[in-house]
Amino acid sequence: MMENLNIQTTTAMFPGLPFLPALEQISRETQKRPELHMDWVQLCPQSFGCVNDGLLVSLKEKYPNTKFQLHSNVRIIHGKEPVHGSSSGKWVDVYLQELIRLTKITGCGIYSIHSGYEDEMSLQDMFSNVRKMNSDCDITIAIEGLYPERNREALVRNWDQYQQLLDADIPYAIDLSHLNIVAKAEGHRFYLVQKLLASYNCKEVHLSSNHGRLDSHLPFIKEKHEWWWPLLEYCQAETRIFSEENLRIQQSKRKKHNVVLRQ
């Protein structure tokens, strides 16, 4: 299936770099790995800097055939907290208006936000909040579920809540590395994951690996090591699949290996 899978890319693959250098690294990586593509690239918070009009103009000039999508928590206004599905208040409206404006410049028409936290609102209230966001905005707002965290109770963090997300009939994004953490805590629910991926409400899927404890964005080298890999065939044709694997880990290991060889 690896040969047939069309995996789009994200600047999370090269964390810590400014957006333009990250895109240069992504371009090189797509030349080495035929399953990776740059038709649609997500601009992620792991990148250094803030997304603004000037950056988007520069990106479109250098990569005219690529659509750029803002990823959840990406910095668009200096000093502002990111908006979650559970966020509310006037500052949220200001943030969303700027986000919508930038998204219209990119032409992609969609933005995904993290589900948020129980200390901000209940799960059902969050679903209602996201429905309102979608009715008020002329872009699609998709919810990205989370996983169990130590210090804060996230919304959409276990299988029961992922089932409720499926039943809520709202747009969503599935991060399979998040589901690996849920599976480590509660056991696998293959049929539920299959249904989540197969739904028309699943607008995008994020891929990376981890050991089931932290969202560490490890590279996936051999698909047979990932329990979720065979389930990707159930995705709708319109669902976009993105790599979020941190490839700077591999670069660091190669540099250390070369230093040892030179000694």
Residue ranges: model-predicted function:
Residues 13-22, 42-58, 76-91, 117-124, ...:
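Acidic-and-aromatic substrate-binding clefts and catalytic sites of carbohydrate-active enzymes
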